[in-house]
């Protein structure tokens, strides 16, 4: 990374550093993630999150390590409804696998980067289990489910600046140990902690569409369709499928955002959390983007967006004072608290006309549909004002507006006030859209 790229990334990440401080994240790590060579980088990034004031709970699984140990001991186990049936001999193997991973996680988190503080990593026995029992005539043996979680205990450990680590085995009130799905543990802890995020590492960079592209944002309703596809194709054991189910449940229970990332790519955790667009798949009941009317609090963001375009001569220069006076005219698209697009609607009621002005989209989003989204929002505002004709003045984007129904016009077609202030030095093209009202 060149110095300029580093500086730019660092500046862009600053709002997210402030946004995430003092927040609580639950991180899900399956056995494949822990066994992967990139795990050392994941733990370094977890340590970085902790140093930024983020409260962390790590819940890990050991499915692949259990399978390896069973094969090594010439043993096997069966599944029913995607849950391992655990007898007493299998449980001993589970304990061995989980214990080894527990040690690996602690040792990795204890490996400090130069000049970084020692991390306070603690193990938690906050989960109390109970047997699954007999379902459909199948005895699950020592496979269990959650009976109770000592959330107060976890909260106390987090308040003491600890990273809390929880594995997939837990005791019952009778002292027996049970094997639990770690995804269930992570999901329920996130829900009961009222965590801000649930983050899952899987073997692909989130959820992919039919063409293999990462879906950056998913509503839980859409996510259910992808989960169904996993199940119908026999891929429920795929880590992405299990994490997707956990994320859907978490979103429905009030967790604002869940993220699915690849454990194979170095830095995926940081890229997902500290950049506008992330790198994996985010599940949320609400979109990370919001289109709304601007307020005075948006003026700094508006200035950051339009200043470069003013300097290039694409937009007419506007002072801060002018923006303050006209702020109610502006519609903005906001992404994670950052203004990425804007447009103003200037009304001329006598002529039943309005101007779409100061149209700006952040460079990172110009190849997307944000311009169309803004135009539709401006048209809706114009309809409410009973505007019959919407016009624009532009020096660079004539063709874009023509493709959307605007027709080239002359100054004679402008409202009287606008015609009197037309800048003949700038010689902007005039385009008008008949709204048909």
UniProtKB/Swiss-Prot annotation:
<dbReference type="InterPro" id="IPR036393">
    <property type="entry name" value="AceGlu_kinase-like_sf"/>
</dbReference>
<keyword id="KW-0028">Amino-acid biosynthesis</keyword>
<dbReference type="GO" id="GO:0006526">
    <property type="term" value="P:L-arginine biosynthetic process"/>
</dbReference>
<dbReference type="Pfam" id="PF00696">
    <property type="entry name" value="AA_kinase"/>
</dbReference>
<comment type="similarity">
    <text>Belongs to the acetyltransferase family. ArgA subfamily.</text>
</comment>
<dbReference type="InterPro" id="IPR016181">
    <property type="entry name" value="Acyl_CoA_acyltransferase"/>
</dbReference>
<keyword id="KW-0963">Cytoplasm</keyword>
<keyword id="KW-0055">Arginine biosynthesis</keyword>
<dbReference type="InterPro" id="IPR010167">
    <property type="entry name" value="NH2A_AcTrfase"/>
</dbReference>
<keyword id="KW-0808">Transferase</keyword>
<dbReference type="InterPro" id="IPR033719">
    <property type="entry name" value="NAGS_kin"/>
</dbReference>
<dbReference type="GO" id="GO:0004042">
    <property type="term" value="F:L-glutamate N-acetyltransferase activity"/>
</dbReference>
<protein>
    <recommendedName>
        <fullName>Amino-acid acetyltransferase</fullName>
        <ecNumber>2.3.1.1</ecNumber>
    </recommendedName>
</protein>
<dbReference type="GO" id="GO:0005737">
    <property type="term" value="C:cytoplasm"/>
</dbReference>
<dbReference type="InterPro" id="IPR001048">
    <property type="entry name" value="Asp/Glu/Uridylate_kinase"/>
</dbReference>
<dbReference type="InterPro" id="IPR000182">
    <property type="entry name" value="GNAT_dom"/>
</dbReference>
<keyword id="KW-0012">Acyltransferase</keyword>
<feature type="domain" description="N-acetyltransferase">
    <location>
        <begin position="289"/>
        <end position="429"/>
    </location>
</feature>
<dbReference type="Pfam" id="PF00583">
    <property type="entry name" value="Acetyltransf_1"/>
</dbReference>
<comment type="pathway">
    <text>Amino-acid biosynthesis; L-arginine biosynthesis; N(2)-acetyl-L-ornithine from L-glutamate: step 1/4.</text>
</comment>
């Amino acid at each position: 990374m060149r110095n300029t790229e580093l500086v730019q990334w660092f500046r862009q990440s600053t709002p997210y550093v402030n946004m995430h401080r003092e927040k609580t994240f639950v991180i899900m790590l399956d056995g494949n993630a822990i066994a992967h060579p990139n795990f050392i980088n994941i733990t370094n990034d977890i340590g970085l999150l902790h140093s930024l004031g983020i409260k962390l709970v790590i819940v890990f699984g050991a499915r692949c390590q259990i399978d390896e140990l069973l094969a090594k001991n010439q043993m096997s186990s069966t599944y029913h409804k995607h849950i391992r049936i655990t007898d007493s001999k299998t449980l001993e193997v589970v304990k061995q696998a989980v214990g080894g991973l527990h040690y690996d996680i602690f040792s990795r988190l204890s490996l400090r980067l130069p000049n970084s503080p020692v991390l306070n990593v603690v193990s938690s026995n906050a989960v109390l289990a109970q047997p699954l029992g007999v379902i459909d005539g199948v005895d699950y043996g020592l496979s269990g489910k959650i009976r109770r979680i000592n959330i107060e205990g976890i909260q106390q450990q987090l308040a003491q600046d600890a990273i809390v680590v929880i594995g997939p085995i837990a005791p019952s009130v009778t002292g027996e140990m049970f094997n639990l799905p770690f995804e269930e543990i992570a999901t329920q802890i996130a829900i009961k902690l009222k965590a801000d995020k649930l983050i899952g590492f899987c073997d692909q960079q989130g959820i992919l569409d039919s063409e293999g592209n990462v879906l950056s944002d998913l509503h839980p309703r859409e996510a259910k369709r992808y989960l169904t596809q996993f199940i119908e194709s026999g891929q429920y054991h795929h880590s992405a499928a299990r994490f997707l189910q956990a994320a859907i449940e978490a979103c429905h229970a009030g967790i604002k955002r869940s993220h699915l990332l690849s454990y194979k790519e170095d830095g995926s955790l940081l890229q997902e959390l500290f950049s506008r667009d992330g790198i994996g798949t985010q599940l949320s009941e609400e979109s990370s983007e919001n289109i709304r009317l601007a307020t005075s609090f948006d003026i700094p963001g508006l200035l950051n967006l339009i200043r470069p375009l003013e300097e290039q001569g694409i937009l007419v220069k506007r002072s801060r004072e002018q923006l303050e006076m006209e702020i109610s005219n502006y519609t903005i698209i906001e992404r994670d608290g950052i203004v990425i697009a804007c447009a103003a609607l200037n009304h001329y009621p006598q002529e039943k006309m309005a101007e779409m002005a100061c149209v700006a989209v952040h460079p990172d989003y110009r190849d997307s549909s944000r311009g169309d989204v803004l135009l539709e929002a401006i048209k809706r505002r114009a309809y409410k004002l009973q505007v019959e004709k919407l016009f624009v003045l532009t020096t660079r984007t004539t063709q874009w507006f023509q493709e959307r129904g605007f027709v080239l016009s002359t100054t004679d077609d402008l409202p009287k006030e606008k015609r009197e202030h037309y800048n003949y030095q700038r010689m902007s093209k005039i385009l008008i859209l008949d709204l048909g009202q």
